[in-house]
UniProtKB/Swiss-Prot annotation:
The keyword Transcription regulation does not apply. Mg(2+) binds at residues 25, 27, 85. This is Dermonecrotic toxin LhSicTox-alphaIA2bi. It is an enzyme of class 4 (lyase). It comes from Loxosceles hirsuta (Recluse spider). It holds the Pfam family GDPD_2. The keyword Metal-binding applies. The active site is at residue 41. Expressed by the venom gland. GO terms for cellular component: extracellular region. InterPro entries: PLC-like_Pdiesterase_TIM-brl (IPR017946). Keywords: Cytolysis, Dermonecrotic toxin, Disulfide bond, Hemolysis, Lipid degradation, Lipid metabolism, Lyase, Magnesium, Metal-binding, Secreted, Toxin. It comes from the Eukaryota. Its cofactor is Mg(2+).
Length: 273
């Protein structure tokens, strides 16, 4: 999965997919009442990027729905996975469940079209704080209450705070999650970060006993870093330059080892070598 980073304006969906991304990451900010409000990152953000692009969240969802609904004039068949980077740092811990409920209602209405031929992309809810694990139950309970438990097949989870793997496992246990887990690791492209925790996550994924199904690394903009990440065995790389990742994947060392994921590749099933 080549994951386009910080895609917060509708026009950027096409821009990143046309550069080679089959997945995008979008920031979601919340208002004081835990309503998802804007697709907005803010300052500071990755070096070389404008941090200030935004849409109203519901408008972005409608644009995303168009891009991921077969038959729509804006349809992009390659776009199969969307990571919502939930900026819950602005919320009190006791608002996490409420944020999950509201997120579910927004997605159901504006993205899934109330279960009637909505967008088809898989969705990852990425949460920065382990203490906000109740967001997951708020989300899953709401989809069930609204009569659409089947849509949970399209939803996965990520805790993005670079916490110890054991602590993340405990948070999922509390949230009642087993499966559909992506594990992120990384840091802004302005700084360097080693791959030791990525390797721990890959080992957990491949052990058959861990909680992780897929691993992604961010933010990967350079060819050398891309090679290191692929060599470490990640499933996804989040990038500002999808074309750089695509180029590296076409190099002799990789072109017979890795390929771009398609809609038929489940993002929840651990790839067995």
């Amino acid at each position: 999965w080549i994951m386009g980073y910080m895609v917060n304006a509708i026009y950027q969906i096409d821009e990143f997919v046309n550069l080679g991304a089959n997945s995008i990451e979008t920031d979601v900010s919340f208002d004081d009442n835990a309503n998802p409000e804007y697709t907005y990152h803010g300052i500071p953000c990755d070096c070389g990027r404008s941090c200030l692009k935004w849409e109203n969240y519901n408008d972005f969802l409608k644009g995303l729905r168009s891009a991921t609904t077969p038959g729509n004039s804006k349809y992009q068949s390659k776009l199969i996975l969307v990571v919502f980077d939930l900026k819950t740092g602005s919320l009190y811990d006791n608002q996490a469940s409420e944020a999950g409920k509201k997120l579910a209602k927004n997605l159901l209405k504006h993205y899934w079209n109330n279960g009637n031929n909505g967008g088809r992309a898989y969705i990852v809810l990425s949460i920065p704080d382990l203490n906000h694990y109740p967001l997951i139950k708020g989300f899953t309970d709401t989809l069930k209450q609204e009569g659409h438990p089947e849509l949970l097949e399209k939803v996965g989870y990520d805790f993005s705070g670079n916490d110890a793997i054991g602590d993340v496992a405990k948070a999922y246990k509390k949230a009642g999650v087993s499966g559909h887990v992506w594990q992120s690791d990384g840091i802004t492209n302005c700084l360097l970060r080693g791959l030791s925790r990525v390797k721990d996550a890959v080992a957990n994924r491949d052990s058959g006993k861990g909680y992780i199904n897929k691993v992604y690394y961010w933010t990967v903009d350079k060819r050398a870093t891309t090679r290191d990440a692929l060599d470490a065995g990640v499933d996804g790389v989040m990038t500002n330059y999808p074309d750089v990742i695509a180029d590296v994947m076409n190099e002799a060392a990789y072109k017979n080892k890795v390929r771009l994921a398609t809609y038929e590749d489940s993002p929840w099933v651990t790839f067995k070598k």
